[in-house]
């Protein structure tokens, strides 16, 4: 198994939210996470609001949680937040059987994924760069 990885330390101008065991494949979740990575939070929320992907609602909820953590726990300015990181991790894979013809069965895999969103407060000089 090895040694457990150390958690990433947050800087003073960062806040994060984690959604664990989302019922979606990591590959599909990463498509939505990549769409908001590096954007201002209000722009990212607007993109998630109108996204046609099924998992966009859960990603939006996690982003709103990260924004609330930044405001309430870290006293950061909500208007100056950007999505610094949005990354996806693999979780469990549930195995199910699907009955087929002639008494056979095939395996269905139902993957799960973890989502971590880190928001960072930036100053006006950093936004222009």
Curated annotation (Swiss-Prot):
PROSITE patterns: RIBOSOMAL_L22. The keyword Ribonucleoprotein applies. Gene3D superfamilies: Ribosomal protein L22/L17. Keywords: Ribonucleoprotein, Ribosomal protein, RNA-binding, rRNA-binding. One of its GO terms (cellular component) is cytosolic large ribosomal subunit. Pfam families: Ribosomal_L22. One of its GO terms (biological process) is translation. The keyword Aminoacyl-tRNA synthetase does not apply. GO terms for molecular function: rRNA binding; structural constituent of ribosome. This protein binds specifically to 23S rRNA; its binding is stimulated by other ribosomal proteins, e.g. L4, L17, and L20. It is important during the early stages of 50S assembly. It makes multiple contacts with different domains of the 23S rRNA in the assembled 50S subunit and ribosome. Belongs to the universal ribosomal protein uL22 family. Part of the 50S ribosomal subunit. This is Large ribosomal subunit protein uL22. It comes from Rhizobium etli (strain ATCC 51251 / DSM 11541 / JCM 21823 / NBRC 15573 / CFN 42). The gene is rplV.
């Amino acid at each position: 198994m090895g040694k457990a990885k150390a958690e990433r330390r947050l800087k003073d101008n960062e806040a994060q939210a984690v959604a664990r065991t989302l019922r979606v494949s990591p590959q599909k979740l990463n498509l939505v996470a990549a769409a908001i990575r590096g954007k201002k939070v209000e722009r990212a929320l607007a993109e998630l609001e109108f996204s046609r992907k099924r998992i966009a609602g859960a990603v939006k909820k996690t982003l709103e949680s990260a924004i609330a953590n930044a405001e309430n726990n870290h006293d950061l300015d909500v208007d100056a937040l950007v999505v610094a990181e949005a990354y996806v991790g693999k979780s469990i894979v549930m195995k199910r059987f699907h009955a087929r013809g002639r008494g056979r069965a095939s395996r269905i895999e139902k993957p799960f994924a973890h989502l971590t969103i880190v928001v960072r407060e930036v100053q006006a000089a950093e936004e222009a760069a």
